[in-house]
A protein has these predicted regions:
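A short, conserved structural fragment
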Residues: 349-359
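Flexible, acidic/Gly-rich N-terminal and inter-domain linker regions that tether
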Residues: 1-7, 14-15
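Minor-groove-contacting beta-hairpin "wing" of winged helix-turn-helix DNA-binding domains
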Residues: 360-364
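C-terminal scaffold of the Radical SAM
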Residues: 2-3, 24-54, 58-335, 391-398
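Short amphipathic alpha-helical interaction segments
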Residues: 335-347
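Alpha/beta-hydrolase
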Residues: 8-10, 125
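Short, amphipathic alpha-helical interaction segments positioned at domain boundaries
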Residues: 366-398
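Local cysteine-cluster metal-coordination motifs and their immediate loop/turn environment
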Residues: 11-24
């Protein structure tokens, strides 16, 4: 299999943030923040080697260590994990990212990342507002975040990305724009601005408020040289895009290792036509994940058929400002994208919210504001055509 992305999930946290639904554990199963945890690291590396061998993966093109809170790992564990991942690589990993909370940043930790070959930091700032941090269960502070950014700026020579969230409890329009402006003033290379996700439906007024926050701050970022290349991601002068995340959005293969880590391996013929896909997700039980002798049992596999894969290509691809590559789509699915959702594309093009180019189909800046509505229309048309377009069923599995 060609080079692939690798995602590593570190499930440890000191406390659970109120808005977070990622799998994590706090000080149990033998975990203590900043202490060595060699058994956990070795188990991760065993699974990395196993997947790489089983699927004949040539190399890791990108690596992303997320969580949870990877910055709670002991510096020695970071060195061991990074070295094990890079073992056998003929070329360095092109992009090697680790997530961190600002309050965990210190010189020794940064040195361990550099020595391990990690070349990109993703810092979960979320907000500089101390009141908003407190009400949302974050353990950091404005002062600690500023100290962390100053430390990184003086000691880190790789890429830097920072996350902010729009719609946090207690947040105002002014506090978010102040947060965005502060990152701009630091000239952070890459900024992610996410709308708050909630398991429970938000009131329409709250949804509208979050949408307006995103619109206003997207404009602020654009005015300061940040190019929006994905609905929630901005690259300064378009030189600092996340290579790993583009694997997700372009529906390319990646492996997920660790409890709750998800990965998708895609099988195509020599011409790029989709054959099958397998999705693995680590079990959400750190105890069983650590002790199971049969490693296939902790990464149950789901087979993704062509219909579902096509839907996912649409869901992910239209998040990108460049949209979906038409020739690549046609190679994968045996027909141009207009054969599947042509009516939706033409309708949205008439509204000037979509562009149908020779090589790409994409939403305009205005269209991206209504991404969810567009996807509902597109999937509805896809479902209709799968049932009976032009008087006969469309063979999506052919």
């Amino acid at each position: 299999m060609k080079p692939s992305g690798l995602y590593i999930h570190i499930p440890f946290c000191t406390q659970k943030c109120r808005y977070c639904d990622f799998y994590s554990i706090t000080q149990k199963a033998g975990f203590f923040p900043y202490h060595p945890n060699p058994q956990f690291i070795e188990r991760l590396l065993q699974d990395v080697r196993s997947f790489k061998e089983r699927y004949a993966i040539e190399a890791w093109e990108t690596v992303y260590i997320g969580g949870g809170t990877p910055s709670l790992l002991h510096p020695g564990d970071i060195r061991t994990l990074a070295a094990g991942i890079c073992e056998g690589q003929k070329q360095p990993v092109q992009e090697f990212t680790i997530e961190a909370n600002p309050e965990d940043i210190h010189p020794e930790w940064l040195a361990a990342c550099s020595e391990g070959g990690i070349n990109r930091l993703s810092i979960g700032v979320q907000t500089f507002d101390n009141d908003v941090l407190a009400v949302n269960g974050r353990r950091g502070s404005k002062e600690k975040t500023i100290t962390a950014l100053n430390t990184i700026k003086s000691r880190w020579h790789g890429e830097l990305s920072c996350d902010l969230i729009a719609g946090l409890t207690g947040q105002t329009a002014q506090s978010l724009s102040d947060d965005v402006q502060r990152l701009i003033d630091y000239r952070i290379e890459h900024i992610s601005l996410y709308g708050l996700c909630s398991e429970e439906p938000l009131p329409d007024t709250r949804e509208d408020f979050i949408s307006e926050l995103l619109r206003e701050n997207t404009e602020l970022l654009a005015e300061n040289g940040y190019i929006r290349y994905e609905v929630s991601n901005f690259s300064y002068r378009d030189k600092h895009r996340s290579l790993h995340n583009q694997i997700y959005w372009n529906m390319e293969p990646y492996v997920g290792i660790g409890p709750a880590a998800c990965g998708t391996l895609i099988h195509e013929d020599s011409g790029g036509k989709f054959i099958a896909a397998e999705r693995f997700e680590g079990i959400k039980d750190i105890g069983k994940w650590m002790t199971a002798a049969d490693r296939t049992s902790v990464y149950p596999c789901e087979h993704i058929d062509r219909n579902i894969f096509l839907e996912e290509v649409l869901l992910m691809g239209f998040r990108l400002s460049e949209g979906i590559n038409r020739p690549a789509f046609a190679r994968r699915f045996g027909a141009d994208i207009t054969a599947f959702i042509g009516n939706t594309l033409r309708l949205w093009e008439k509204r000037r919210q979509c562009r149908i180019g020779a090589d790409r189909v994409y939403l305009t800046e205005e269209g991206l504001l209504f991404l969810n509505r567009f996807l509902i229309d597109a999937l509805s048309e896809l479902d209709t055509k799968a049932q009976c377009p032009a008087g006969k069923p469309l063979d999506l599995d052919g």
